[in-house]
Amino acid sequence: MQTILEKLYRSESMNQQESQQLFSAIVRGELEPSQLAAALISMKIRGEHPEEIAGAAKALLADALPFPRPDYPFADIVGTGGDGTNSINISTASAFVAAACGAKVAKHGNRSVSSRSGSSDLLAAFGIRLDLPAEEARKALDELGVCFLFAPQYHTGFRHAMPVRQQLKTRTVFNVLGPLINPARPPLALIGVYSPELVLPIAETLRVLGYQRAAVVHGGGMDEVAIHATTHVAELNNGEIESYQLTPQSFGLQSYPLEALLGGSPEENRDILARLLQGKGDPAHAAAVAANVALLLKLFGHEDLRQNAQQALDMIHSGQAYERVTALAARG
């Protein structure tokens, strides 16, 4: 371990195996707080490489509680958080709409990082049980097309890093790991990142981790597909990565200002999304969710983004997405 730490102090990068070794020690609580802080800051200053991020993700997945992985195609839709926009929970709403469109979504999430309401905060406000046992969550995925996996329930080793992360008060590799350590190990993922510089490195990390198809996005300051600006995308498909840009017009949608997507407390966000998913919501909110669902559906092989967005809007207006919310809450 000391050899790996010395390497970091010399600003050298680790290979995947070394990173996996380091992060295995971290989640087992084997590092002193000072060593952990030094390792995280050394990586941050030099810039984390895809092989290192992948090694860390593998260590955390190896340490995670097991989830009965389905053999059918399913996806995660998740953002790093930390984009500072305090928007409504677009990815959470998108998971329910995508499920209503026939996709299977196992969403991995946590409590809020930067906004006043993370995906877990919102689901709790809907009365959805966060700590559903793995077998029951899998059943929800089979039957409703959507389930939610609460990170602290599966990743108990994370707690060893928490005090140091809180003291450092700065982003570290842990801020990008959340979306990469879904215990269900989905083959498909739509991942939003808080900075455009992360789009390609995270796509490369997903390639190392063996994802079949995934899209990493950043849109105008948001860790989602944007309807107020251009979205930068790196799409991984069978080992090849293609970078491109999308605008609201790519989805046949009109643009809306970022202010139109502002969220509030978990209770306020719940009311906003309840109206939206019942087909009575704000057109800007519907457009934002439709754009994200459209790109997610592309990963399942539905290549026409405009058609996908229209299907998502139809599903939103029909109120069928909200039935998934109430059905999931009823399993509590």
Curated annotation (Swiss-Prot):
It comes from the Bacteria. GO terms for biological process: L-tryptophan biosynthetic process. Its EC number is 2.4.2.18. It catalyses: N-(5-phospho-beta-D-ribosyl)anthranilate + diphosphate = 5-phospho-alpha-D-ribose 1-diphosphate + anthranilate. InterPro entries: Anthranilate_Pribosyl_Tfrase, Glycosyl_Trfase_fam3, Glycosyl_Trfase_fam3_N_dom, Glycosyl_Trfase_fam3_N_dom_sf, Nuc_phospho_transferase. NCBIfam families: trpD. PANTHER family: ANTHRANILATE PHOSPHORIBOSYLTRANSFERASE (PTHR43285:SF2). Belongs to the anthranilate phosphoribosyltransferase family. This is Anthranilate phosphoribosyltransferase. It comes from Serratia proteamaculans (strain 568). The lineage of its organism: Bacteria, Pseudomonadati, Pseudomonadota, Gammaproteobacteria, Enterobacterales. The gene is trpD.
